[in-house]
């Protein structure tokens, strides 16, 4: 979607955002603007709903187009990231790499990607739950299943019988935060995992 937008109709800052968003289409982009992390377009719609924060809009282009926008204060961002991550969202943190100046657009870069299963930052983890990421692959007569808590180093590898219900039961029991599969894994099962 974002790669098909004519960026020339937008302000330099919004072009910068859209360029970053092109590289992270399935990720909520937290874009640092001064003392806030802002989200735009569809990210703003999703974040405002999930975080129950106000959705506003911003003038973003030469044709006075206003785009959806919401934001959170930088000093409280951890709380919001934890909420979104616990709901299964991936987040890209885009920080300002220099002080703002009136002469040019501030350089910004993605400084961190947070996913439900790869999160190792104590700020975003719950002390009472493991933070497992799992991987599953189809074997000739069953499934290979590995799950790891990257924050503690705990690693488990096992095989599961052919019937996928065993796998579903393991997912429920372990509260896996994120699953990695490949294209050979049956589509019906991948669709189930998305839920």
Regions found by a protein language model. Name each.
Residues 1-195:
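Basic, polar low-complexity surface loops/patches
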């Amino acid at each position: 979607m974002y790669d098909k937008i004519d960026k020339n109709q937008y302000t330099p800052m919004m072009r910068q955002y859209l360029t970053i968003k092109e590289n992270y289409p399935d990720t909520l982009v937290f874009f640092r603007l001064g003392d806030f992390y802002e989200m735009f377009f569809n990210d703003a719609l999703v974040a405002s709903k999930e975080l129950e924060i106000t959705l506003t809009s911003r003038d973003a282009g030469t044709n006075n187009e206003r785009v959806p926008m919401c934001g959170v204060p930088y000093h409280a961002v951890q709380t919001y990231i934890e909420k979104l991550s616990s709901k299964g969202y991936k987040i890209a943190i885009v920080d300002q790499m220099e002080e703002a100046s009136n002469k040019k657009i501030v350089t910004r870069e993605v400084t961190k990607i947070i996913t439900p299963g790869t999160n190792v930052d104590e700020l975003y983890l719950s002390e009472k739950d493991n933070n497992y990421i799992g991987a599953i692959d189809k074997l000739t007569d069953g499934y290979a299943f590995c799950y790891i808590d990257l924050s503690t180093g705990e690693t488990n590898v096992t095989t599961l019988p052919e019937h996928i219900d065993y796998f579903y039961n393991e997912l429920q029991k372990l509260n896996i935060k994120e699953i990695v599969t490949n294209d050979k894994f049956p589509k019906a099962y991948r669709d189930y995992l998305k839920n």
